[in-house]
A protein has these predicted regions:
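Glycine/aspartate-rich loop-and-adjacent alpha/beta segment that forms the canonical ThDP
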Residues: 112, 146-190
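Short gly/pro/ser/thr-enriched loop/turn and capping motifs at secondary-structure boundaries
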Residues: 25-26, 47-49, 77-78, 102-106, ...
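Short coil/turn connectors at secondary-structure junctions
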Residues: 12-15, 35-38, 63-68, 89-95, ...
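Conserved thiamine diphosphate
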Residues: 62-152
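A short acidic, glycine-rich active-site loop
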Residues: 42-46, 116-124, 189-190
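Active-site diphosphate/adenylate-binding microenvironment
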Residues: 1-54, 59
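Buried hydrophobic positions in well-ordered alpha/beta secondary-structure cores of metabolic enzymes
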Residues: 7, 17-19, 58, 74, ...
Length: 190
């Protein structure tokens, strides 16, 4: 949650924030503050992995004076990274913050909590998204420690180009689901 505290301090109040599906973005919903509506765009209950980046591009086109920040995990951004070419070609200057934990975080947390840490298909290998962004002609920033996020966000917004901030997140820091939140889905077998 330290990441979101830092973002609260550095994001301009006119920011529009787009969220993806997944546990890191669920945390962001509660941890960030939103001003100047419409300022929060999320697929919350629909599980649209990869939604945030494309949504951010659309919000920026509709509201060009707003600072637009898209928050996503590495899995979701990996699905939609090719849209960077659209952002660069048309000058759609958003900032995408990729919380890179080298896993499908929601699935991994679910497997940890409900399947005794028996992980299947939860870990992924993601590229250095900051470097990939630069290959597309966007700006790329790497954040290895939370203390570096403010400077990276300021530089990304100031760059006036599509920007990607690749943030290293501890893959063991999983956001657990409440065990009772799925109780209604249990089937009783006799």
């Amino acid at each position: 949650k330290g990441l979101f505290k830092q973002l609260r301090r550095v994001l301009p109040k006119n920011s529009a924030i787009t969220l993806d599906a997944g546990t890191l973005c669920l945390q962001a919903t509660d941890a960030l503050e939103y001003y100047d509506p419409p300022s929060l765009f999320t697929p919350l209950d629909f599980g649209l992995v990869g939604f945030s980046f494309a949504c951010g591009l659309g919000v920026k086109v509709a509201k060009p004076k707003k600072t637009v920040v898209s928050l996503m995990g590495d899995g979701g951004f990996g699905m939609t990274i090719s849209e960077l070419s659209t952002a660069v070609e048309y000058g759609i200057n958003t900032t995408t913050i990729v919380m890179n934990n080298q896993s499908w975080g929601a699935e991994k947390a679910y497997q940890k909590d409900f399947f005794g840490k028996r992980y299947l298909g939860a870990d992924i290998t993601s590229p250095s998204f900051d470097k990939v962004a630069e290959l597309y002609g966007a700006r790329g920033f790497k954040v290895k420690k939370i203390s570096e996020i403010n400077e990276a966000v300021r530089a990304a917004i100031k760059s006036n180009k599509p920007s990607v901030i690749d943030v290293d997140v501890d893959p063991k820091a999983l956001y657990s689901f409440r065990r009772d939140s799925f109780k209604h889905r249990e089937k009783k077998w006799s």
